[in-house]
């Protein structure tokens, strides 16, 4: 009904992508924007962790062919909302962050139960990461500079610890942080970005540790790059 309305009122044809199509477009976007395409084609296993605002999609490719995808209904926007929504005036920021970390581990149990067998491999899994939290974690500004940055699991853990220290020094209670971000306090945009990183990055760490992945490569390209490349070359 909505798609029909858009077509009739705006004259635009809109198509909703299936999981496989979205995963393929995401990986095509990464390839399209990467310099060392030959090296990438030699990777036997490639995993894409695409963390959006509402969910996180984990997709696996083997020798260039799509294997499977799994959607974890936790994204950075959901986690940020829960960080504040589940807190009271007496909830410390430490307690609130511990809650979101626990929630990630809890939701990942279903992923492990349903999908872990697909990801078990003696060969290393080349991992591509997409999303605001992971691109911000590069410490670089602009998608072009962020694209292709390699982050080790240890470096991501260090980033989480650094964010923890900074946020907890400045805000004792979760409500204090919420008030600052919501009402546009000093550097509120930067603080909000730190919150997004802090709640989003543990998802990558948990997946990397469980699957034995030592490092990942950040993609600074959007899904539309993949759609464009598919239409350009097909």
Regions found by a protein language model. Give the residues of each.
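Active-site-adjacent helix-turn-beta-strand microarchitecture at beta-sheet edges
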Residues: 52-58
């Amino acid at each position: 009904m909505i798609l029909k309305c858009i077509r009739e009122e705006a004259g635009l044809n809109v198509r909703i992508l299936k999981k496989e199509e979205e995963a393929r477009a995401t990986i095509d976007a990464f390839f399209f924007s990467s310099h060392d395409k030959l090296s990438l084609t030699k990777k036997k296993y490639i995993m894409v962790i695409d963390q959006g605002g509402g969910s996180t999609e984990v997709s696996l490719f083997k020798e260039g062919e799509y294997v499977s995808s799994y959607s974890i209904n936790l994204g950075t926007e959901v986690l940020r909302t829960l960080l504040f929504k589940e807190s009271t005036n007496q909830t410390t920021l430490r307690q609130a962050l511990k809650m979101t970390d626990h929630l990630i581990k809890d939701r990942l149990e279903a992923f492990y139960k349903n999908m872990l067998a697909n990801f078990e491999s003696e060969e290393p899994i080349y991992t591509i990461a997409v999303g605001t939290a992971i691109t911000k974690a590069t410490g670089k500004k602009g998608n072009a500079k962020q694209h292709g940055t390699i982050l080790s699991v240890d470096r991501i853990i260090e980033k989480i610890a650094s964010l923890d220290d900074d946020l907890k020094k400045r805000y004792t209670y979760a409500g204090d942080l919420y008030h600052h971000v919501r009402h546009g306090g000093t550097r509120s945009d930067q603080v909000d970005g730190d919150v997004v990183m802090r709640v989003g990055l543990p998802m990558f760490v948990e997946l990397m540790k469980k699957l034995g992945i030592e490092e990942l490569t950040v993609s600074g390209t959007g899904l539309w790059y993949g759609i464009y490349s598919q239409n350009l070359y097909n």
